[in-house]
Amino acid sequence: MDNKIVYVVSDSVGETADLVVRAAMGQFPFAPDIRRVPYVEDTGTLKEVISIAKSNQALICFTLVKPDMRQYLVTEAAKEGVEAYDIIGPLIDQIEEITGQVPRYEPGVVRRLDEEYFKKIEAIEFAVKYDDGRDARGILKADIVLIGISRTSKTPLSQYLAHNKRLKVANVPLVPEVDPPEELYQVAKEKCFGLKITPEKLNHIRKERLKSLGLSDGATYANINRIKEEIDHFENVVSKINCQVIDVSNKAIEETANIIVNAVQNQKMF
């Protein structure tokens, strides 16, 4: 048997049915002629496919999640003497029986889940690439830009937003001795968020950081006057950008992230 025609019918892209058919056909010594019929939404299309399949003595394999569409195809194909194989329906029915849960009957769910997964991975990779001001070009590409002095949770917040909200985040450290990148003044202020912290809180955090590294907590890094100088520089930069400032002194990463996400969503509404 050469080039047996198989019509792959789906209410979405049809990738699932296509893969299953190819896997099954791979067990036989003939080359299948697989013809995909995607995004089927009405019985008229099904009737047409049945007619064509009959004239070509073809097999129909389908993934239709809506029960009425599945039943129509099976019934009408049988009337015309056309073999129609339901790839996903019996499994959906079995899972419903075992769990007692009603299916959503939404076409293309797997595809949407795959897209969400890859968006998350892309966002995580972006956060790593443009962490700590490594490449200023990321500022203009980012969904969100975080700015702040050292130890204001820029990196963990970037990763949290990437992993949980699928947002591409670049973060930029501010140091008095180094001019901020020009891109920081070019980005839309609505995308930019300054992370502020009290001198006392930051002094404690930095001292603990130095201790964890086996260093003296008397270093300039944890000096209160140095910290105040850095905060003054931060205030000067954010005033020029005119971006929203969030006090992270007593906030968990999740809380700060929610403030940012809500701000972004509100901007999109108006």
From Swiss-Prot:
Belongs to the pyruvate, phosphate/water dikinase regulatory protein family. PDRP subfamily. This is Putative pyruvate, phosphate dikinase regulatory protein. One of its GO terms (molecular function) is protein serine/threonine kinase activity. PANTHER family: PYRUVATE, PHOSPHATE DIKINASE REGULATORY PROTEIN 1, CHLOROPLASTIC. The keyword Kinase applies. It comes from the Bacteria. NCBIfam families: PRK05339.1. InterPro entries: Kinase-pyrophosphorylase, PPDK_reg. Pfam families: Kinase-PPPase. Keywords: Kinase, Nucleotide-binding, Serine/threonine-protein kinase, Transferase. It catalyses: N(tele)-phospho-L-histidyl/L-threonyl-[pyruvate, phosphate dikinase] + ADP = N(tele)-phospho-L-histidyl/O-phospho-L-threonyl-[pyruvate, phosphate dikinase] + AMP + H(+); N(tele)-phospho-L-histidyl/O-phospho-L-threonyl-[pyruvate, phosphate dikinase] + phosphate + H(+) = N(tele)-phospho-L-histidyl/L-threonyl-[pyruvate, phosphate dikinase] + diphosphate. ADP binds at G148, I149, S150, R151, T152, S153, K154, T155. Bifunctional serine/threonine kinase and phosphorylase involved in the regulation of the pyruvate, phosphate dikinase (PPDK) by catalyzing its phosphorylation/dephosphorylation. Its EC number is 2.7.11.32, 2.7.4.27.
